């Protein structure tokens, strides 16, 4: 556990396990032998409140009965409603769209709302995502990290605009190009890729796969007037694309199956070429 410069707490527990880790989505998987409806599940939940001086990190165990279609999100809500109203965790959409419920599930970052309890039980250990500032228990401030990263990368279209004309039609775009941009825009900023990243766990200024993916998205956009030289000034160092160690934990855990491996390799190749000019 470490302290941030502004007094926040970042908790680093349970490193990502690339090999032999349980599945973290609701894709069809075979449940472990013996996990069936009516069986008791044991949830070992990391508890810690950085705002309470008396609080210390510890695992707290809860038991719930397995029910059909129970996700970890459903289980956590049941724990909070019936067993412990003080338990903190995040959620919004419950459909794998907002990314709020991301956490470390049996050592692997994933979304609670897209993980079936039967796929990771009967013994389930939950912890907050590392790297991000801890709010309490399973709740972390991914928004603060993502905002700082986006502002640093200037993650918006840079357009040499004349006077604003609300009557002018939007510029046309080739449908195939629009689809390529949309593919990268599917990122939900859940933070799973950052938490699975070895570099991000070692240096706080690394932009992670989510940042490199943003650069790849705007580089595709014909409305953005920036050049590779401009992008090199932003990500052409060890805190940017050259900090990636190619462990590809990010690619393994992305709940939206984004082509992170391809985009990281592509952007790094372009930045190497730019740096050699």
What are these regions (language model features)?
Residues 46, 57, 104-107:
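Short strand-turn-strand beta-turns centered on an Asx-Gly dipeptide
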Residues 58-71:
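Short, contiguous acidic and Ser/Thr-rich linear segments
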Residues 37-43:
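Short structural boundary motif marking the start of a folded domain
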Residues 93-102:
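Short, structured protein-protein interaction patches enriched in aromatics and acidic/basic residues
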Residues 2-33:
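Short, Gly/Pro- and small/polar-rich lid/capping loops
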Residues 69-85, 124-277:
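Ferredoxin-type iron-sulfur electron-transfer modules in oxidoreductases and energy-metabolism complexes
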């Amino acid at each position: 556990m470490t302290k941030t410069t502004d007094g926040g707490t970042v908790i680093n527990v349970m490193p990502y396990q690339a090999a032999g880790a349980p599945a973290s989505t609701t894709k069809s998987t075979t449940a472990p032998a013996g996990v069936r409806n009516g069986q008791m599940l044991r949830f070992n939940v990391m508890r810690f409140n950085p705002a309470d001086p008396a609080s210390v990190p510890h695992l707290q165990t809860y038991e719930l009965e397995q029910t059909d279609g129970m996700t970890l999100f459903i289980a956590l809500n049941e724990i909070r409603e019936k067993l412990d109203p003080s338990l903190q965790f995040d959620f919004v959409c419950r459909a794998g769209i907002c990314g709020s419920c991301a956490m470390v599930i049996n050592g692997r970052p994933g979304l609670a709302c897209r993980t079936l309890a039967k796929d990771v039980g009967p013994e389930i250990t939950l912890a907050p995502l590392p790297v991000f500032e801890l709010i309490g228990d399973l709740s972390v401030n991914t928004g603060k990290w993502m905002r700082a990263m986006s502002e640093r990368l200037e993650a918006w279209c840079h357009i040499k605009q004349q006077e604003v004309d609300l009557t002018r039609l939007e510029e046309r775009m080739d449908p195939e190009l629009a689809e390529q941009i949309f593919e990268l825009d599917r990122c939900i900023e859940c933070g799973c890729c950052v938490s699975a990243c070895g570099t991000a766990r070692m240096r706080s200024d690394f932009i992670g796969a989510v940042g490199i993916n943003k650069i790849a998205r705007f580089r595709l956009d014909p409305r953005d007037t920036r050049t590779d030289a401009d992008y090199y000034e932003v990500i052409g160092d060890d805190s940017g694309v050259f900090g990636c160690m190619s462990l590809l934990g990010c690619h393994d855990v992305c709940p939206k199956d984004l082509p992170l491996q391809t985009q990281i390799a592509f952007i790094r190749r372009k930045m190497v070429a730019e740096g050699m000019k």
